[in-house]
Amino acid sequence: MAGRQAIPVVLGRAGILANKREGDGATPHGRFRILRLWWRADRAPRPRTLLPAFRIERALAWCEDPSDRRYNRPFRRSANEPGDRLWRDDGLYDLVIEISHNTRPRVAGRGSAVFLHVARPERSATAGCVALTAPDLRRLLARLGPGTWIDIRP
């Protein structure tokens, strides 16, 4: 629900878990702050939102390695470095909303790169994120700003 409006979403292939772990395929249970928007400026103009917004660049990735000091943070990836690339050809990360799951404090192995992002056309399960159609995500973005929260629950 967004206010009084129901918006269909796709969740992680393992459902919703309170004890999220890295790579478990689950969407974390809890209440999280909406932090910022990342978007592909080469594909669309900056979406209407009150959130802080940042352009996704080719080298931008999200650290998923629990042993790395950059864990669950964005970083500029070199050609051979692992990480969840935000610059994707499939359009799933054309709009990415970062939430506060495992951010303060960051705990190694408790899950990283949990976003709201664009759903696959067939609406298949995610690796743990919350996915929406691009039009629904754009409509939602127009209503989001600093201080907005998301409740993820069964």
How does the language model describe each region?
Residues 129:
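Short cysteine clusters
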Residues 132:
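A conserved hydrophobic position in a structured secondary element of the catalytic/binding core
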Residues 1-126, 138-154:
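Cell wall/extracellular polymer interaction/catalysis modules
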